[in-house]
Regions:
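Gly/Pro/Ser/Thr-rich low-complexity, intrinsically disordered segments predominantly at protein N-termini
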Residues: 1-185
């Protein structure tokens, strides 16, 4: 088992500092990211765009240095900017699924990096049932929606059927509960 984890070693480099990215801390992280990836991939058919899940480095300012991150989910439409295992264009959409070891960096350094790179839409998703949606407006991220899943249909504040759409791809939509399907199994 130690060998398998050693082989997985993935890293990010931000502001010249190298961070090890551990494998998903628990199954919930993988389920949430997998659910989103499946919905988005299905919606991108015949669009010319691609969705990547934790397997493509994003060089967020290649003209300045060699810093890069590995978003949990990223949509790219400019295939000319794909070079080996890296993308140095501007993604249309990025999702970071929070884990204890990355939550602070996802909310601070990565958010600023994505904002400066010009990523139009950024979602921060917690496997515990929340989704924060940021849109880039005049060069700054603005929180436009913040969902906390209330999945008990008997409760007055049930919102599992609330529909969320991607800004750049409004035909790609999902119910809030679909993002977290299987997490409590």
């Amino acid at each position: 088992m130690a060998l398998a984890q050693e082989e997985y070693r993935k890293q990010e480099k931000m502001n010249g500092i190298i961070y090890d990215i551990s494998p998903s801390p628990n199954f919930r992280h993988g389920i949430v990211s997998g659910n989103l990836h499946a919905i988005i991939k299905n919606g991108l058919k015949h669009s010319g765009c691609l969705v990547f899940m934790r397997n493509l480095d994003f060089k967020y300012h290649p003209e300045k240095n060699d810093d890069y991150v590995v978003p949990d989910i990223m949509i790219v439409c400019d295939r000319k900017q794909l070079k080996g295992g890296c993308y140095d264009g501007v993604p249309k959409f990025i999702v970071e699924t929070l884990s204890p070891s990355t939550a602070l960096r996802d909310r601070t350094e990565k958010k600023v990096a994505y904002e400066k790179a010009g990523v139009e839409e950024y979602w921060i998703v917690s496997p515990q049932g929340s989704v924060e949606i940021y849109y880039l407006e005049d060069g700054k991220y603005v929180l436009v929606s913040n969902y906390i899943l209330q999945n008990d249909k008997e409760e007055e504040d049930y919102n599992g059927e609330d529909v969320i759409s991607l800004r750049a791809f409004p035909h790609i939509s999902m119910e809030l509960r679909e993002i977290f399907e299987g997490v409590d199994s």
